[in-house]
Amino acid sequence: MLHTLHRSPWLADFAALLRLLSEGDELLLLQDGVTAAVDGNRYLESLRNAPIKVYALNEDLIARGLTGQISNDIIPIDYTDFVRLTVKHSSQMAW
């Protein structure tokens, strides 16, 4: 399943998101959700322990001035890669 986090993790039900993640799921951080990619924050630590890959939309990182602050564990992607993720996963949950 593809999970997309659009909101800041401080404003989303992040605990529920973590509970629903399964092995093989992928999480895309976009819009204000990219703040979860900033190295050293508590939400990133939780994502590191999850059995998933985590991506962040590069355009949203740039728009928020975060490109130099994200963790090496996060995979920056562009809109083309975003489309590939949506095609790959038949189901999606937006947070």
UniProtKB/Swiss-Prot annotation:
The keyword Cytoplasm applies. Part of a sulfur-relay system required for 2-thiolation of 5-methylaminomethyl-2-thiouridine (mnm(5)s(2)U) at tRNA wobble positions. SUPFAM superfamilies: DsrEFH-like. This is Protein TusB. Pfam families: DsrH. HAMAP family: Thiourid_synth_B. PANTHER family: PROTEIN TUSB (PTHR37526:SF1). It is found in: Cytoplasm. Keywords: Cytoplasm, tRNA processing. InterPro entries: DsrEFH-like, Sulphur_relay_TusB, Sulphur_relay_TusB/DsrH. GO terms for cellular component: sulfurtransferase complex. Its main location: cytoplasm. It comes from the Bacteria. Belongs to the DsrH/TusB family. One of its GO terms (biological process) is tRNA wobble position uridine thiolation. Heterohexamer, formed by a dimer of trimers. The hexameric TusBCD complex contains 2 copies each of TusB, TusC and TusD. The TusBCD complex interacts with TusE.
